[in-house]
Amino acid sequence: MKNIRNFSIIAHIDHGKSTLSDRIIQICGGLSDREMEAQVLDSMDLERERGITIKAQSVTLDYKASDGETYQLNFIDTPGHVDFSYEVSRSLAACEGALLVVDAGQGVEAQTLANCYTAMEMDLEVVPVLNKIDLPAADPERVAEEIEDIVGIDATDAVRCSAKTGVGVQDVLERLVRDIPPPEGDPEGPLQALIIDSWFDNYLGVVSLIRIKNGTLRKGDKVKVMSTGQTYNADRLGIFTPKQVDRTELKCGEVGWLVCAIKDIHGAPVGDTLTLARNPAEKALPGFKKVKPQVYAGLFPVSSDDYEAFRDALGKLSLNDASLFYEPESSSALGFGFRCGFLGLLHMEIIQERLEREYDLDLITTAPTVVYEVETTSREVIYVDSPSKLPAVNNIYELREPIAECHMLLPQAYLGNVITLCVEKRGVQTNMVYHGNQVALTYEIPMAEVVLDFFDRLKSTSRGYASLDYNFKRFQASDMVRVDVLINGERVDALALITHRDNSQNRGRELVEKMKDLIPRQQFDIAIQAAIGTHIIARSTVKQLRKNVLAKCYGGDISRKKKLLQKQKEGKKRMKQIGNVELPQEAFLAILHVGKDNK
């Protein structure tokens, strides 16, 4: 056991985590040169296309160190994006140490800080690494100072390397072996294994990634899931070298995969503890804190025949993604679908794209909303995650919206722009600290504003230099209203949105104008209105298509023309009473982009 090292790699987006892991795999001979490709661990097509890591991946490698010993390295590559920070905390729970990778050109950014603090809270040994020293813009001395100044860990002898060229990666491994402590645990004790991650394989059933904390797991053992009390047979187990390799046992301190032929996707929840049925452990390991979704949106299949397939797909995805929440929902405009909870907009996009690609579904998304806390006049507190669930205005005593605490790191030059943006988003400044020419800003901004387009706008006002990390702080009373969209006097539930009263006029007007462009013209006038309760705040009309009934009257008598026009008018009126308006898919998407184009 003293030769096992469990660690994960944490860093801000694009600081070179995945490239560094490629190099480590290459040096330790995990893959032959022929099988080597860039970002080996980003196995999803989606990850490769966007160049981001979404799922944490684990690898077991053997490394012969300069002291002559051979060490077993179990390492986990983690995502850098704020929406996937729960993946990071899960991975860290399985490790004793973490490599903090910092780009020697960019320096410390918000996620670097957030992930590093997560690691420190879990008492992990953090080893700083300065990456990309081959870049002309690299300034390792300044960045080392920044790490000490902002993060507060000693970086005087931080390892310098360039994952792209491979310079210094050997030193990173040596430092790892030296500084990160071996796992603790009792190899002879009753088995306790933490489930770090699970995913569904069509042939094998549920595959779980586990970290053995105490005891040993052998092939053929009967294992028990502690939260459900169910027992299964350990059919196959092994490690990833990135390839799946079968083993006969997993020892104390190791990280590996396990297949128990579990067909039910909720059979092995992430964060649960496995133990042996014949000699169970007394208590479960502390799992992970459940992450609460921050953004909710309705997902509906375009054709109602896909509903069953959609339900199965969501089940399989939620196994792989512990933070995805979903419950059935029906809408008069869109039929049956699900109300899903996500961690942020990127997460929502990724899930939708994975559903469309991996499960071949066509989906419509409604506008994302956050969770509001509503106190009714009968003093009952309810949580509302969709505009249609909001009680009538006269039943609401107080409506509270979630406030996010946003930590931003940015160069001083962009401070003015960013403050203007935060104020526009109804933010309140709580802290501001200068570190050299960087500024650390802390603002409290309503979650609804953050999830809408705050991240994109922050990046564009600061030319991409500002970085953001946010977390939920509290609920706060606020003057929020529900804006309904009426089409020919009928409410369309899928288009309602909750917004602040100050913005409601603008949002309503914009939405109505957008809808006007998107709804095709019909044989009769279509009135599109935005309303708060019964009060109409904006209206526009899609003009009817009409035939020129006077074309055949040459010169002619005025009364003849009047008669024809009158006849046409009556026909249109009759049509309007029975006519239905077909809303195109783009109309539902328009609501996602309200307030984006006019900046």
From Swiss-Prot:
Bilayer topology annotation: Peripheral membrane protein
Compartments where located: Cell inner membrane
Domain of life: Bacteria
One term of GO molecular function: ribosomal large subunit binding
Classification via PROSITE patterns: G_TR_1 (PS00301), G_TR_2 (PS51722)
Function recorded in the entry: Required for accurate and efficient protein synthesis under certain stress conditions. May act as a fidelity factor of the translation reaction, by catalyzing a one-codon backward translocation of tRNAs on improperly translocated ribosomes. Back-translocation proceeds from a post-translocation (POST) complex to a pre-translocation (PRE) complex, thus giving elongation factor G a second chance to translocate the tRNAs correctly. Binds to ribosomes in a GTP-dependent manner.
Protein name: Elongation factor 4
Protein encoded by which gene: lepA
